[in-house]
A protein has these predicted regions:
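Extracellular/periplasmic bilobal clamshell ligand-binding domains
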Residues: 302-342
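Periplasmic-binding protein-like
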Residues: 133, 196-200, 237-263
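Mature extracytoplasmic/periplasmic domains
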Residues: 260-318
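N-terminal secretory signal peptides and thylakoid transit peptides that target proteins
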Residues: 1-16
């Protein structure tokens, strides 16, 4: 049976209203929480475009930090979260996980999980670390005669007295400083009485919530816990600084991925998570931020040996912490920090 002209035009119009598979994919949007500043720009320039090529989906960035993302999730509730995936420090992830926001990872949808180091999987199957920013000891080479070799030197080298910088307790690094001191001078990381006493024994310190670089550059401090990548950047700017990888192990900022149990784009979230764990994305992150990749297939090349000292077999030097313990005692520990450390 032949179509008349009106029927043919009607059929064409109806077909035009039906989205193609490619168009449908383009209509899907994944909201990705990310840090601001250089992280946001890197995500816009590198990560988001690469994921769009892979998935055909759009990416909308929601800029903030772990505290902001947690507040947004709690305001919406576990049943209607604004995100499908969250990447943040485990200290924030642990509390949200306990409140029922995240699901146990479906590893069938996350094949690159099997290529990660064991140190990246310490969340009981609920999350996975994409990368670490290891923290050792940074110092001024022109103001220190005896460079540190280990964390204990912060207490034992008289040159450092009243010239030490610390992150404050609001920062996850401040919490790690307490647990580290507890481990160094007490029975274990839970021996916070010993930890607080040790921190008090440091004497007067300069504390910051985020940036120790300004104080180090100005000579207000001569030594502090420092992200290796930050020391590498300061050194390239001509500042007389260096770092050491402490003998007792390193602290580290983690970027832990979590899938929302009731997220609006959960399948897309798994694609995105698997992409971030891929060798290609891990290479981008390592070269962009000097982070330690968690995919075992990606190791720091010789030209990045200084910028990324913790890689390959050295990933085992990253110290692990009980964030459930920290979160359970958050208020008490914060008050003790304020009265003991300042």
């Amino acid at each position: 049976m032949e179509l008349n002209r009106r029927q043919a035009l009607g059929a064409l119009a109806a077909a035009a209203l039906l989205p193609t598979r490619a168009a449908f994919a383009q209509q899907r949007t994944l909201i990705v929480p990310t840090l601001g500043g250089v992280w946001e720009q890197f995500w816009r320039d590198k990560i988001a475009p690469e994921f769009t090529k892979l998935s055909g989906a759009n990416v909308t960035l929601d800029v903030g930090n772990g505290r902001v993302f947690g507040a947004n999730l709690r305001a919406a509730g576990p049943q209607k979260p604004p995100y499908s995936i969250v990447m943040t420090n485990e200290v924030f992830s642990e509390g949200l996980r306990k409140e029922g926001f995240f699901e146990q990872l479906d590893l069938a949808k996350l094949p690159n999980y099997n290529s990660t180091y064991q140190v990246a999987r310490n969340t009981g199957g609920y999350g996975v670390v994409v990368c670490y920013s290891p923290v050792g000891i940074g110092y001024r080479t022109d103001m220190v005669q005896t460079p540190p070799k280990r964390w204990h030197d912060l207490w034992e080298n008289p040159e450092f007295r009243n010239r030490i910088g610390l992150y404050n307790f609001a920062n996850s690094a401040g919490k790690m400083e307490l647990l580290l001191a507890s481990r160094l001078f007490g029975k274990d990381q839970y021996d916070v009485d010993a930890g607080f006493k040790a921190l008090a024994d440091l004497g007067q310190v300069i504390q910051v919530d985020f940036n120790l670089s300004t104080a180090l550059a100005a000579g207000e401090i001569v030594v502090a816990p420092f992200d290796f990548a930050e020391i590498a950047r300061l050194k390239k700017q001509g500042l007389p600084v260096d770092y050491v990888v402490p003998e007792e192990g390193v602290m580290a900022f983690d970027q832990t991925l979590n899938i929302l149990a009731n997220g609006p784009e959960k399948e897309l979230a798994y694609q995105y998570a698997n992409f971030l764990l891929s060798p290609e994305a891990q290479e981008l992150l390592m070269r962009g931020f000097y982070v330690s990749p968690t995919n075992t297939a990606v190791k720091a090349p010789e030209e990045l040996a200084y910028e990324v000292p913790i890689s390959g077999d050295r990933m085992s030097e990253i110290l692990q912490w009980d964030w459930a313990f920290v979160n359970e005692h958050q208020n008490e520990l914060s008050e003790r920090w304020a009265s003991t450390v300042g």
